[in-house]
Swiss-Prot record:
One of its GO terms (cellular component) is cytosol. One of its GO terms (biological process) is gamma-aminobutyric acid catabolic process. Its EC number is 1.2.1.97. It comes from Pseudomonas putida. One of its GO terms (molecular function) is succinate-semialdehyde dehydrogenase (NAD+) activity. This is 3-sulfolactaldehyde dehydrogenase. InterPro entries: Ald_DH/histidinol_DH, Ald_DH_C, Ald_DH_CS_CYS, Ald_DH_CS_GLU, Ald_DH_N, Aldehyde_DH_dom, Aldehyde_DH_Superfamily, Succ_semiAld_DH. It is an enzyme of class 1 (oxidoreductase). It comes from the Bacteria. Induction: Is highly up-regulated during growth on sulfoquinovose, compared to growth on glucose or succinate (at protein level). Keywords: NAD, NADP, Oxidoreductase. The lineage of its organism: Bacteria, Pseudomonadati, Pseudomonadota, Gammaproteobacteria, Pseudomonadales. NADP(+) binds at residues 157-158, 181-184, 234-235, 257, 387. Belongs to the aldehyde dehydrogenase family.
Length: 486
Protein backbone atom coordinates (compact mmCIF):
# COMPACT_ATOMS: atom_id res chain seq x y z
CA UNK A 1 0.00 0.00 0.00
CA UNK A 2 1.30 3.45 -0.94
CA UNK A 3 1.60 5.54 2.22
CA UNK A 4 1.71 9.32 1.84
CA UNK A 5 1.80 12.11 4.41
CA UNK A 6 -0.91 13.77 2.34
CA UNK A 7 -3.08 10.98 0.87
CA UNK A 8 -5.07 13.55 -1.13
CA UNK A 9 -2.13 13.81 -3.54
CA UNK A 10 -2.95 10.34 -4.87
CA UNK A 11 -5.58 11.40 -7.39
CA UNK A 12 -7.78 9.00 -9.34
CA UNK A 13 -9.54 11.59 -11.50
CA UNK A 14 -8.34 13.89 -14.26
CA UNK A 15 -8.35 17.68 -13.91
CA UNK A 16 -10.18 19.75 -16.54
CA UNK A 17 -11.20 23.41 -16.23
CA UNK A 18 -10.59 23.48 -12.50
CA UNK A 19 -12.65 20.34 -11.77
CA UNK A 20 -11.68 16.77 -10.84
CA UNK A 21 -13.57 14.58 -13.29
CA UNK A 22 -13.99 10.96 -14.40
CA UNK A 23 -14.17 9.78 -18.00
CA UNK A 24 -17.48 10.33 -19.78
CA UNK A 25 -17.64 6.57 -20.36
CA UNK A 26 -16.81 5.74 -16.76
CA UNK A 27 -13.91 3.60 -18.01
CA UNK A 28 -10.62 3.45 -16.12
CA UNK A 29 -7.19 1.88 -16.52
CA UNK A 30 -4.85 0.50 -13.89
CA UNK A 31 -1.56 2.07 -12.86
CA UNK A 32 0.77 -0.58 -11.45
CA UNK A 33 4.05 -0.58 -9.56
CA UNK A 34 6.67 -2.10 -11.94
CA UNK A 35 8.67 -3.39 -8.96
CA UNK A 36 5.84 -5.36 -7.38
CA UNK A 37 3.04 -5.59 -9.93
CA UNK A 38 0.64 -4.13 -7.36
CA UNK A 39 -2.17 -1.90 -8.57
CA UNK A 40 -1.69 1.66 -7.31
CA UNK A 41 -4.75 3.39 -8.72
CA UNK A 42 -7.37 3.38 -11.43
CA UNK A 43 -7.29 6.44 -13.67
CA UNK A 44 -9.92 7.79 -16.12
CA UNK A 45 -9.65 6.39 -19.65
CA UNK A 46 -10.55 9.58 -21.48
CA UNK A 47 -10.72 10.33 -25.17
CA UNK A 48 -11.44 13.03 -27.73
CA UNK A 49 -14.50 14.56 -26.05
CA UNK A 50 -12.72 15.26 -22.77
CA UNK A 51 -9.65 16.58 -24.60
CA UNK A 52 -11.89 18.94 -26.59
CA UNK A 53 -13.37 20.31 -23.37
CA UNK A 54 -9.90 20.84 -21.92
CA UNK A 55 -8.81 22.78 -25.01
CA UNK A 56 -11.92 24.98 -24.91
CA UNK A 57 -11.33 25.64 -21.20
CA UNK A 58 -7.72 26.56 -21.94
CA UNK A 59 -8.93 28.93 -24.65
CA UNK A 60 -11.32 30.67 -22.24
CA UNK A 61 -8.61 30.92 -19.59
CA UNK A 62 -5.91 32.22 -21.93
CA UNK A 63 -6.80 35.92 -22.18
CA UNK A 64 -7.30 36.52 -18.44
CA UNK A 65 -4.05 34.66 -17.73
CA UNK A 66 -2.20 36.56 -20.46
CA UNK A 67 -3.41 39.87 -19.01
CA UNK A 68 -1.93 39.16 -15.61
CA UNK A 69 1.35 40.96 -15.10
CA UNK A 70 4.55 38.97 -15.36
CA UNK A 71 5.03 39.55 -11.65
CA UNK A 72 1.61 38.09 -10.84
CA UNK A 73 2.28 34.97 -12.92
CA UNK A 74 5.72 34.66 -11.35
CA UNK A 75 4.27 34.79 -7.84
CA UNK A 76 1.81 31.99 -8.62
CA UNK A 77 4.59 29.84 -10.09
CA UNK A 78 6.70 30.48 -6.99
CA UNK A 79 3.78 29.32 -4.83
CA UNK A 80 3.56 26.16 -6.95
CA UNK A 81 7.30 25.62 -6.47
CA UNK A 82 6.99 26.13 -2.69
CA UNK A 83 4.21 23.53 -2.50
CA UNK A 84 6.38 21.04 -4.39
CA UNK A 85 9.18 21.62 -1.88
CA UNK A 86 6.75 21.16 0.99
CA UNK A 87 5.43 17.88 -0.46
CA UNK A 88 8.57 16.50 -2.06
CA UNK A 89 8.68 13.32 0.06
CA UNK A 90 5.19 12.34 -1.10
CA UNK A 91 5.98 13.32 -4.70
CA UNK A 92 9.11 11.15 -4.61
CA UNK A 93 7.20 8.17 -3.26
CA UNK A 94 4.53 8.55 -5.94
CA UNK A 95 7.20 8.75 -8.62
CA UNK A 96 9.08 5.67 -7.39
CA UNK A 97 5.87 3.69 -7.01
CA UNK A 98 4.62 4.28 -10.55
CA UNK A 99 7.94 4.47 -12.42
CA UNK A 100 10.25 2.17 -10.45
CA UNK A 101 13.40 4.25 -10.03
CA UNK A 102 15.12 4.25 -6.60
CA UNK A 103 13.90 6.84 -4.12
CA UNK A 104 17.23 8.68 -4.26
CA UNK A 105 16.87 9.05 -8.03
CA UNK A 106 13.27 10.18 -7.60
CA UNK A 107 14.44 12.94 -5.26
CA UNK A 108 17.08 13.87 -7.83
CA UNK A 109 14.43 14.13 -10.53
CA UNK A 110 12.26 16.25 -8.26
CA UNK A 111 15.14 18.62 -7.59
CA UNK A 112 15.72 18.98 -11.31
CA UNK A 113 12.03 19.29 -12.15
CA UNK A 114 11.30 21.85 -9.45
CA UNK A 115 14.25 23.97 -10.56
CA UNK A 116 12.51 24.59 -13.89
CA UNK A 117 9.48 26.05 -12.10
CA UNK A 118 11.66 28.32 -10.00
CA UNK A 119 13.73 29.36 -13.03
CA UNK A 120 10.79 30.17 -15.30
CA UNK A 121 9.00 32.02 -12.52
CA UNK A 122 11.91 34.44 -12.73
CA UNK A 123 12.11 34.34 -16.54
CA UNK A 124 8.48 35.49 -16.71
CA UNK A 125 9.77 38.94 -15.74
CA UNK A 126 12.50 38.93 -18.39
CA UNK A 127 10.53 38.69 -21.64
CA UNK A 128 11.89 41.75 -23.40
CA UNK A 129 11.04 43.40 -26.70
CA UNK A 130 13.01 45.82 -28.91
CA UNK A 131 12.87 49.18 -30.56
CA UNK A 132 14.37 49.38 -34.03
CA UNK A 133 15.95 52.49 -35.57
CA UNK A 134 13.32 53.92 -37.88
CA UNK A 135 13.81 54.20 -41.68
CA UNK A 136 12.21 57.65 -41.75
CA UNK A 137 11.51 60.48 -39.30
CA UNK A 138 7.74 59.90 -39.23
CA UNK A 139 7.95 56.26 -38.07
CA UNK A 140 8.74 54.30 -34.92
CA UNK A 141 9.35 50.53 -35.03
CA UNK A 142 8.53 48.42 -31.98
CA UNK A 143 8.94 44.66 -31.45
CA UNK A 144 7.04 42.88 -28.67
CA UNK A 145 6.92 39.25 -27.58
CA UNK A 146 3.51 37.83 -26.75
CA UNK A 147 2.28 34.45 -25.47
CA UNK A 148 1.43 32.18 -28.36
CA UNK A 149 -1.92 31.05 -26.93
CA UNK A 150 -3.27 27.65 -25.94
CA UNK A 151 -0.48 25.08 -25.73
CA UNK A 152 -0.51 21.30 -25.34
CA UNK A 153 2.00 18.65 -24.38
CA UNK A 154 2.42 14.88 -24.29
CA UNK A 155 5.02 13.63 -21.82
CA UNK A 156 6.80 10.27 -21.35
CA UNK A 157 6.98 7.78 -18.48
CA UNK A 158 10.74 7.84 -17.78
CA UNK A 159 10.79 11.23 -16.00
CA UNK A 160 7.14 11.80 -15.05
CA UNK A 161 7.86 14.90 -12.96
CA UNK A 162 10.68 16.75 -14.72
CA UNK A 163 9.34 16.24 -18.25
CA UNK A 164 6.15 17.98 -17.16
CA UNK A 165 7.58 20.96 -15.28
CA UNK A 166 10.02 21.85 -18.04
CA UNK A 167 7.06 22.22 -20.44
CA UNK A 168 4.33 23.60 -18.19
CA UNK A 169 6.50 26.14 -16.34
CA UNK A 170 7.70 28.10 -19.40
CA UNK A 171 4.23 27.97 -20.96
CA UNK A 172 2.56 29.45 -17.88
CA UNK A 173 5.39 31.92 -17.31
CA UNK A 174 4.99 33.22 -20.86
CA UNK A 175 1.26 33.74 -20.34
CA UNK A 176 0.00 30.64 -22.15
CA UNK A 177 -2.49 28.04 -20.96
CA UNK A 178 -1.61 24.33 -21.16
CA UNK A 179 -3.38 21.00 -21.69
CA UNK A 180 -1.25 18.00 -20.72
CA UNK A 181 -1.61 14.33 -21.55
CA UNK A 182 0.83 12.31 -19.37
CA UNK A 183 2.02 8.78 -20.16
CA UNK A 184 -0.48 6.15 -19.06
CA UNK A 185 2.22 4.21 -17.19
CA UNK A 186 2.93 7.21 -14.94
CA UNK A 187 -0.02 9.62 -14.61
CA UNK A 188 0.06 9.90 -10.80
CA UNK A 189 2.91 12.42 -10.73
CA UNK A 190 1.10 14.61 -13.26
CA UNK A 191 -2.11 14.55 -11.24
CA UNK A 192 -0.27 15.39 -8.02
CA UNK A 193 1.44 18.29 -9.78
CA UNK A 194 -1.79 19.77 -11.08
CA UNK A 195 -3.34 19.33 -7.62
CA UNK A 196 -0.54 21.46 -6.19
CA UNK A 197 -0.99 23.99 -9.01
CA UNK A 198 -4.65 24.26 -8.03
CA UNK A 199 -3.65 24.83 -4.39
CA UNK A 200 -1.18 27.49 -5.52
CA UNK A 201 -4.04 29.48 -7.01
CA UNK A 202 -3.38 28.94 -10.70
CA UNK A 203 -6.80 29.69 -12.26
CA UNK A 204 -9.19 27.11 -13.68
CA UNK A 205 -8.47 26.20 -17.29
CA UNK A 206 -4.90 27.48 -17.27
CA UNK A 207 -3.48 23.99 -16.61
CA UNK A 208 -5.53 20.85 -17.28
CA UNK A 209 -4.46 17.19 -17.24
CA UNK A 210 -6.32 14.71 -19.45
CA UNK A 211 -5.55 10.99 -18.98
CA UNK A 212 -6.27 8.08 -21.28
CA UNK A 213 -6.11 7.24 -24.97
CA UNK A 214 -2.90 8.47 -26.58
CA UNK A 215 -4.45 8.28 -30.05
CA UNK A 216 -7.72 10.07 -29.30
CA UNK A 217 -6.34 12.72 -26.97
CA UNK A 218 -3.26 13.23 -29.13
CA UNK A 219 -5.37 13.75 -32.25
CA UNK A 220 -7.26 16.58 -30.55
CA UNK A 221 -4.14 18.23 -29.14
CA UNK A 222 -2.32 18.13 -32.50
CA UNK A 223 -5.32 18.85 -34.72
CA UNK A 224 -7.39 21.42 -32.83
CA UNK A 225 -7.10 24.89 -34.42
CA UNK A 226 -7.22 26.60 -31.01
CA UNK A 227 -4.00 24.86 -29.92
CA UNK A 228 -1.17 27.03 -31.23
CA UNK A 229 1.85 25.24 -29.76
CA UNK A 230 2.49 21.53 -29.19
CA UNK A 231 5.36 19.96 -27.24
CA UNK A 232 6.30 16.27 -27.18
CA UNK A 233 8.98 14.12 -25.60
CA UNK A 234 9.20 10.57 -26.92
CA UNK A 235 10.39 8.44 -29.81
CA UNK A 236 11.38 9.82 -33.21
CA UNK A 237 8.80 7.75 -35.18
CA UNK A 238 5.96 9.02 -32.99
CA UNK A 239 7.37 12.54 -33.11
CA UNK A 240 7.32 12.48 -36.92
CA UNK A 241 3.69 11.37 -36.88
CA UNK A 242 2.73 14.16 -34.47
CA UNK A 243 4.60 16.79 -36.52
CA UNK A 244 2.55 15.71 -39.53
CA UNK A 245 -0.67 16.07 -37.56
CA UNK A 246 0.37 19.52 -36.34
CA UNK A 247 1.14 20.61 -39.90
CA UNK A 248 -2.57 20.70 -40.78
CA UNK A 249 -3.01 23.77 -38.55
CA UNK A 250 0.60 25.01 -38.84
CA UNK A 251 1.33 24.75 -35.13
CA UNK A 252 4.59 25.70 -33.53
CA UNK A 253 6.19 22.48 -32.26
CA UNK A 254 8.88 21.46 -29.81
CA UNK A 255 10.16 17.91 -30.09
CA UNK A 256 12.60 16.11 -27.80
CA UNK A 257 12.99 12.79 -29.58
CA UNK A 258 15.20 9.72 -29.70
CA UNK A 259 18.92 9.60 -29.07
CA UNK A 260 21.89 7.35 -29.76
CA UNK A 261 24.41 9.06 -27.51
CA UNK A 262 28.11 8.34 -27.97
CA UNK A 263 30.30 8.25 -24.85
CA UNK A 264 33.96 8.57 -25.87
CA UNK A 265 36.93 7.79 -23.63
CA UNK A 266 40.33 8.86 -24.99
CA UNK A 267 43.63 7.38 -23.81
CA UNK A 268 44.48 10.56 -21.91
CA UNK A 269 41.22 10.58 -19.92
CA UNK A 270 40.98 10.37 -16.15
CA UNK A 271 39.95 6.71 -16.13
CA UNK A 272 38.13 6.68 -12.80
CA UNK A 273 36.24 9.86 -13.69
CA UNK A 274 35.24 8.32 -17.03
CA UNK A 275 33.97 5.14 -15.35
CA UNK A 276 32.00 7.23 -12.87
CA UNK A 277 30.48 9.21 -15.75
CA UNK A 278 29.66 6.07 -17.71
CA UNK A 279 27.87 4.59 -14.71
CA UNK A 280 25.76 7.72 -14.30
CA UNK A 281 25.05 8.13 -17.99
CA UNK A 282 24.35 4.47 -18.72
CA UNK A 283 22.69 3.01 -15.64
CA UNK A 284 20.72 5.93 -14.17
CA UNK A 285 17.02 5.04 -14.31
CA UNK A 286 18.05 1.54 -15.48
CA UNK A 287 19.31 3.07 -18.73
CA UNK A 288 15.87 4.44 -19.59
CA UNK A 289 16.83 8.00 -20.45
CA UNK A 290 16.90 9.78 -23.80
CA UNK A 291 20.41 11.13 -23.12
CA UNK A 292 21.97 7.94 -21.74
CA UNK A 293 25.17 6.56 -23.28
CA UNK A 294 24.09 4.12 -25.99
CA UNK A 295 27.51 3.59 -27.61
CA UNK A 296 30.64 3.66 -25.46
CA UNK A 297 33.81 4.17 -27.52
CA UNK A 298 37.08 3.46 -25.71
CA UNK A 299 40.53 4.07 -27.20
CA UNK A 300 42.82 1.06 -27.64
CA UNK A 301 45.35 2.05 -24.98
CA UNK A 302 42.88 1.89 -22.07
CA UNK A 303 40.17 -0.39 -23.45
CA UNK A 304 40.81 -3.43 -21.22
CA UNK A 305 41.30 -1.39 -18.04
CA UNK A 306 38.15 0.63 -18.67
CA UNK A 307 36.12 -2.51 -19.42
CA UNK A 308 37.31 -4.19 -16.23
CA UNK A 309 36.51 -1.17 -14.04
CA UNK A 310 33.10 -0.59 -15.64
CA UNK A 311 32.11 -4.26 -15.30
CA UNK A 312 33.07 -4.22 -11.61
CA UNK A 313 31.10 -1.04 -10.98
CA UNK A 314 28.04 -2.32 -12.87
CA UNK A 315 28.11 -5.61 -10.98
CA UNK A 316 28.09 -3.64 -7.72
CA UNK A 317 24.67 -2.10 -8.38
CA UNK A 318 21.94 -3.39 -6.09
CA UNK A 319 18.60 -4.15 -7.70
CA UNK A 320 15.29 -4.03 -5.89
CA UNK A 321 12.16 -2.09 -5.03
CA UNK A 322 13.09 1.58 -5.17
CA UNK A 323 11.72 2.33 -1.70
CA UNK A 324 14.15 -0.10 -0.05
CA UNK A 325 17.32 1.32 1.49
CA UNK A 326 20.47 0.76 -0.54
CA UNK A 327 18.74 -0.04 -3.84
CA UNK A 328 20.58 1.59 -6.75
CA UNK A 329 18.66 0.18 -9.73
CA UNK A 330 14.95 -0.44 -10.02
CA UNK A 331 12.98 -2.46 -12.56
CA UNK A 332 12.50 -1.61 -16.20
CA UNK A 333 9.14 -0.10 -17.01
CA UNK A 334 7.57 -3.21 -18.59
CA UNK A 335 8.10 -6.52 -20.37
CA UNK A 336 8.52 -4.93 -23.81
CA UNK A 337 11.44 -2.89 -22.52
CA UNK A 338 13.11 -6.05 -21.20
CA UNK A 339 12.66 -7.84 -24.50
CA UNK A 340 14.43 -5.09 -26.42
CA UNK A 341 17.48 -5.34 -24.14
CA UNK A 342 17.50 -9.12 -24.59
CA UNK A 343 17.24 -8.68 -28.35
CA UNK A 344 20.23 -6.34 -28.46
CA UNK A 345 22.34 -8.63 -26.26
CA UNK A 346 21.46 -11.72 -28.30
CA UNK A 347 22.24 -9.97 -31.59
CA UNK A 348 25.59 -8.70 -30.30
CA UNK A 349 26.68 -12.09 -28.93
CA UNK A 350 25.73 -13.82 -32.18
CA UNK A 351 27.95 -11.35 -34.06
CA UNK A 352 31.02 -11.75 -31.86
CA UNK A 353 30.60 -9.55 -28.79
CA UNK A 354 31.77 -10.81 -25.39
CA UNK A 355 29.69 -10.67 -22.21
CA UNK A 356 31.66 -9.57 -19.11
CA UNK A 357 28.84 -8.56 -16.74
CA UNK A 358 25.14 -9.31 -16.37
CA UNK A 359 23.31 -10.34 -19.49
CA UNK A 360 20.06 -11.77 -18.17
CA UNK A 361 16.89 -11.16 -16.19
CA UNK A 362 17.51 -10.72 -12.50
CA UNK A 363 16.52 -13.35 -9.95
CA UNK A 364 13.95 -10.88 -8.56
CA UNK A 365 11.82 -11.64 -11.62
CA UNK A 366 9.35 -9.26 -13.21
CA UNK A 367 11.03 -6.59 -15.30
CA UNK A 368 14.27 -6.49 -13.32
CA UNK A 369 17.32 -6.89 -15.56
CA UNK A 370 20.97 -7.24 -14.61
CA UNK A 371 23.33 -4.35 -15.44
CA UNK A 372 25.13 -5.63 -18.51
CA UNK A 373 28.50 -4.88 -20.12
CA UNK A 374 29.54 -6.17 -23.56
CA UNK A 375 33.01 -5.85 -25.10
CA UNK A 376 34.24 -6.20 -28.70
CA UNK A 377 31.07 -4.57 -29.98
CA UNK A 378 31.09 -3.47 -33.64
CA UNK A 379 29.12 -1.20 -35.94
CA UNK A 380 27.37 -4.21 -37.50
CA UNK A 381 25.38 -4.90 -34.33
CA UNK A 382 21.88 -3.55 -33.60
CA UNK A 383 23.06 -1.74 -30.50
CA UNK A 384 25.18 0.54 -32.70
CA UNK A 385 22.15 1.86 -34.55
CA UNK A 386 19.12 1.45 -32.27
CA UNK A 387 18.40 3.10 -28.94
CA UNK A 388 18.46 0.29 -26.36
CA UNK A 389 16.76 2.20 -23.52
CA UNK A 390 17.97 -0.25 -20.92
CA UNK A 391 20.91 -1.24 -18.65
CA UNK A 392 23.22 -2.42 -21.44
CA UNK A 393 26.68 -0.87 -21.88
CA UNK A 394 28.30 -1.85 -25.22
CA UNK A 395 32.03 -1.08 -25.53
CA UNK A 396 33.43 -0.26 -28.98
CA UNK A 397 37.16 0.10 -29.73
CA UNK A 398 38.72 3.00 -31.63
CA UNK A 399 42.22 4.10 -32.55
CA UNK A 400 42.20 7.76 -33.58
CA UNK A 401 40.32 10.98 -32.91
CA UNK A 402 39.16 11.32 -36.51
CA UNK A 403 37.89 7.74 -36.53
CA UNK A 404 35.81 8.07 -33.38
CA UNK A 405 34.27 11.40 -34.37
CA UNK A 406 33.18 9.85 -37.66
CA UNK A 407 31.72 6.85 -35.82
CA UNK A 408 29.97 9.05 -33.27
CA UNK A 409 28.34 11.15 -35.99
CA UNK A 410 27.26 8.14 -38.09
CA UNK A 411 23.65 8.29 -36.93
CA UNK A 412 20.47 10.16 -37.77
CA UNK A 413 20.22 11.20 -34.12
CA UNK A 414 21.86 14.18 -32.45
CA UNK A 415 20.66 14.69 -28.88
CA UNK A 416 23.46 14.23 -26.32
CA UNK A 417 27.12 13.21 -26.56
CA UNK A 418 29.95 12.83 -24.07
CA UNK A 419 33.71 12.51 -24.15
CA UNK A 420 36.59 12.36 -21.70
CA UNK A 421 40.01 13.86 -22.39
CA UNK A 422 42.57 16.07 -20.64
CA UNK A 423 43.98 17.54 -23.88
CA UNK A 424 42.61 21.09 -24.24
CA UNK A 425 43.13 21.13 -27.99
CA UNK A 426 41.23 17.88 -28.37
CA UNK A 427 38.48 19.15 -26.07
CA UNK A 428 37.91 22.13 -28.36
CA UNK A 429 38.18 20.16 -31.62
CA UNK A 430 35.89 17.30 -30.64
CA UNK A 431 33.32 19.62 -29.02
CA UNK A 432 33.06 21.48 -32.32
CA UNK A 433 33.01 18.35 -34.51
CA UNK A 434 30.35 16.33 -32.69
CA UNK A 435 26.97 16.79 -34.42
CA UNK A 436 24.85 16.94 -31.27
CA UNK A 437 22.73 19.52 -29.51
CA UNK A 438 24.54 18.87 -26.23
CA UNK A 439 28.11 17.85 -25.47
CA UNK A 440 29.35 16.80 -22.03
CA UNK A 441 33.13 17.09 -21.60
CA UNK A 442 34.51 15.15 -18.63
CA UNK A 443 31.02 15.00 -17.15
CA UNK A 444 27.80 13.09 -17.74
CA UNK A 445 25.64 15.46 -15.69
CA UNK A 446 24.62 17.99 -18.33
CA UNK A 447 20.92 18.68 -17.70
CA UNK A 448 19.96 21.70 -15.62
CA UNK A 449 17.41 24.51 -15.75
CA UNK A 450 19.95 27.14 -16.84
CA UNK A 451 21.09 25.35 -20.00
CA UNK A 452 19.26 24.79 -23.31
CA UNK A 453 18.25 21.12 -23.56
CA UNK A 454 17.54 19.72 -27.02
CA UNK A 455 18.86 17.96 -30.08
CA UNK A 456 19.66 18.33 -33.76
CA UNK A 457 18.98 16.14 -36.79
CA UNK A 458 16.19 13.63 -36.03
CA UNK A 459 16.49 14.13 -32.28
CA UNK A 460 14.20 17.10 -32.21
CA UNK A 461 13.26 20.74 -32.60
CA UNK A 462 13.45 23.57 -30.09
CA UNK A 463 15.04 23.84 -26.65
CA UNK A 464 13.82 23.39 -23.08
CA UNK A 465 15.28 25.20 -20.09
CA UNK A 466 17.49 28.31 -20.07
CA UNK A 467 16.44 31.74 -21.30
CA UNK A 468 15.82 30.14 -24.70
CA UNK A 469 13.17 27.78 -23.31
CA UNK A 470 10.51 30.44 -22.87
CA UNK A 471 10.97 31.63 -26.46
CA UNK A 472 9.18 28.53 -27.75
CA UNK A 473 5.99 29.80 -26.08
CA UNK A 474 6.20 33.34 -27.47
CA UNK A 475 5.36 35.02 -30.77
CA UNK A 476 7.13 38.09 -32.11
CA UNK A 477 4.89 41.04 -33.01
CA UNK A 478 6.16 44.02 -34.98
CA UNK A 479 4.34 47.37 -34.63
CA UNK A 480 5.04 50.21 -37.08
CA UNK A 481 3.88 53.64 -35.85
CA UNK A 482 3.46 56.26 -38.57
CA UNK A 483 2.93 60.00 -38.55
CA UNK A 484 4.74 60.55 -35.27
CA UNK A 485 6.74 63.58 -36.51
CA UNK A 486 3.68 65.86 -36.63
Amino acid sequence: MLELKDPSLLKQQAFIDGLWVSADSGETFAVTNPATGDELARIPQMGAAEAERAVLAAHRAFKPWKRKTAKERAELLQRWYALMLENQEDLARLLTAEQGKPLAEAHGELGNGMSFVQWFAEEAKRVYGDTIPQPSADKRLIVTKEPIGVTAAITPWNFPHAMITRKVAPALAAGCSMVLRPASQTPLSALALVALAERAGIPAGVFSVVTGSATQIGSVLTGHPLVRKFSFTGSTPVGKLLIGQCAETVKKVSMELGGNAPFIVFDDADLDLAVEGAMLSKFRNAGQTCVCANRIYVQDGIYERFAEKLAAAASGLRLGNGVEAGVTQGPMIDENAVRKVEEHISDALEKGARLIAGGQRHALGGSFFEPTVLTEVTAQMKVAHEETFGPLAPLFRFSSEDEVVELANATEFGLASYFYSRDIGRVLRVSEDLEYGMVGVNTAAIANEMAPFGGVKQSGLGREGSRYGIEDYLEIKYVCLGGVDR
